[in-house]
Amino acid sequence: GPASYEAPMGEIHGEVASKWQYKIRNGKMIYEFESDVKIDDEILKAELGSNGEVQLKNIIRTIQKEQNAIIRNTKDRIMVIQGAAGSGKTSVALHRIAYLLYHDRQNLKSSNILILSPNGVFSDYISHILPELGEENIKEMSFDLFAYRQLKDTVSDCEDRYDQIERSLNFPDMPSLYKEKQSREFLNRMEGYLTSLEDELMDFHDVEYKSFTKKEEEIIDLFYFKFQDIPLLSRMEAVAENFIDEVETLRDNDMDEEERAIVMEKFMNMYETQDLYVIYSRFLESCGYPGLPHVQLQERKLRYEDVYPVLYMKYRLLRQTSHNGIKHLVVDEMQDYSRLQYLILKMMFPCRMTILGDKAQTMEDEAQDVLGFLPKIFGKEIRRIVMNKSYRNTVEIASYANQLAGITDMD
């Protein structure tokens, strides 16, 4: 297609008819080959640059064509890639990030991308490719670390997935509640409990400040009607701001910070508690589970099975600072995320996503039907892609591995 570049004599325009990769050492051509996309595998580059079989080169070009269509897809908002081991899904996702940064460089910067991955494969690649695009490194972390950072004002520590697995192995007789607390039934019970909090958590009364009064009836009306769309634990703040606006209008001058704090405290004290840890513990007890230990903040540690239910509850009860700065989210190892975790991701990140993984590499006892429930969460915005051809192994090895894993849809 058409292209241009800056030169000392001005901008040069032309047409890119083909792309070639070269390796030259000490004035000697090591290899050269035509390629639609950048290839980083040294063995593959050497093979393509040799006088090898035409069939191999045709196969590689076919692979490139299929993968290139995924890399350059800018139409679908949520792209989900189920890829077998050796199918090239990680390479596709990496090149997709680079392509999107280049294609939409006016609106998308490396700071607008977040990668949730339990390993460093993405950052290793990106640290090499992004300098070529003039970009800084992209933020990458595990979802467990991200969740802990969101909850550090509620607890002092959170168990991660690997610690939870190790605990299960060391104490096999201890019942695991992870699946129960990630289930749809558990979430439905939580939603019912959150609805009941609308009344149970509140103790309404008149508010007086100097010569100004806000009657209980008016507070209730504002709380349950005018501001009903605001999350429960953030709603009274809106009611207080309404009162502050009225006072400032009537006396024709603004409150100072100390006055605002006094008024805000009067309104916020109508909550029986605002402690998310306490609220979740009471919810557990209402469901017949043991409550959380009654300890101070610095001693609070959540088990892994409770981390994401608490995070979900936080996003339902409190108005959150949105992550609008993140315009593209990459989720690696999608097979290890629960339905609840995807619901949280949808709430936290109203942006484009690339989600990838392999159901055969799950850490769970049995593979989840991630491709089945994701459309129910994200709706019609999702595009599912299955890469079931493995290019890493011989036919014999792949066939034997498929038999062991009970996989029938991988070539």
Predicted features and spans:
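Conserved P-loop NTPase-based nucleic-acid remodeling module centered on helicase motor cores
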Residues: G1, G134-M202, E208-F223, F227
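N-terminal accessory nucleic-acid engagement/regulatory domains that precede
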Residues: G1-A46
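P-loop NTPase Walker
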Residues: I39-D163
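Short glycine/proline-rich turn/loop motifs
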Residues: D41-L48, L292-V295, E381-R383
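Inter-lobe coupling/hinge region of RecA-like P-loop helicase motors
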Residues: N51, R72, D76-A85, E166-Y178, ...
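Conserved helicase motor core of SF1/SF2 NTP-dependent helicases
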Residues: Q106-N107, S111, G120-E136, M141-Y148, ...
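Active-site-adjacent beta-strand anchor residues
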Residues: I115-L116, L233, M387
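Conserved helicase NTPase catalytic core signature
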Residues: L187, E191, S196-H328, S338-Y342
